[in-house]
Design a protein with these regions (language model features):
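Sec-dependent signal peptide recognition
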Residues: 1-7
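Structural preference for beta-rich elements and adjacent junctions enriched in aromatics
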Residues: 13-235
């Protein structure tokens, strides 16, 4: 029998995980790469698991009229994400060139993917945003630096959107190069990440801010990596 003091010392020497969320999404492997076109009715998305969220980022309010679904696929070169977003009204920047990166995109309707391919480096991750009119933003995040968001980083991720006005549904498809994050995926890989959505006009207090894995209400609340969920890459 191991002496109690030795057992306690052994337990204390094992690093505790910094993550406090166990929510997970499975990302399935796809053999053939494809370019995003915003059509989420195509066969590749029909049988993959979906994660659904309709609560605000703290989990205290629910917005069933803003039901959001997200799914993921991966290949040897890319990780893909698809969003289905119920909406009330569309709020976007008007008359701008969607080919150009848009700083402050989070102040309009947007879906956001936060990805950490190296979970041991809790404060280092990547952010990808797309709006209903296909404007975009990508950032490398390092919370140990000031400023913590590097807008000069360019992932060359591809994205496309479609809006179904009859169903009050806007859809987004993303394809993110693994090389941009200096990583690769094999079956069994596990990343950390979160999915967010912003909807509505006015201040943050007036808008609807949703999260897949809930976070603590605080300044820069979305940047709370200890609350990132698990993305499991399966065959």
């Amino acid at each position: 029998m191991i002496p109690l003091i030795a057992l306690l010392l052994t337990m204390s020497s094992q690093p505790a995980t910094p993550y406090t969320s166990n929510i997970s999404l499975s990302s399935q492997h796809v053999r053939r790469d494809f370019v995003p076109d915003g059509d989420l009715d195509k066969g590749v998305w029909r049988l993959v698991p979906h994660a659904t969220f309709e609560h605000n980022f703290t989990g205290e309010k629910r917005y069933p009229e803003l039901k959001t679904e997200v799914a993921s696929l991966w290949s040897d070169k890319y990780v893909y994400f698809a969003f289905w977003c119920k909406y009330r009204e569309i709020n976007v920047y008007q008359g701008e060139d969607p080919a150009k990166e848009r700083w402050g995109l989070w102040e309009r309707d947007v879906v956001e993917v936060f990805l950490n391919p190296e979970p041991a480096k809790v404060n280092h991750y990547y952010e990808f945003e797309v709006s209903p009119n296909n404007q975009w933003l990508d950032l490398e995040i390092n919370l140990d630096k000031k400023p913590f968001n590097d807008a000069g980083w360019n992932s060359s991720f591809e994205h496309a959107v479609r809006i179904d006005k009859e169903r009050h549904l806007w859809m987004c498809e993303m394809r993110i190069p693994l090389s941009a994050m200096k990583t690769r995926i094999v079956p069994g890989s596990q990343w950390r990440g979160n999915f967010y959505r912003a909807e509505g006009t006015g201040s943050d207090e007036q808008r609807s801010l949703l999260a897949w894995s809930t976070v603590v209400a605080r300044p820069e609340a979305f940047h709370n990596p200890s609350r990132f969920g698990v993305i499991r890459f399966v065959p």
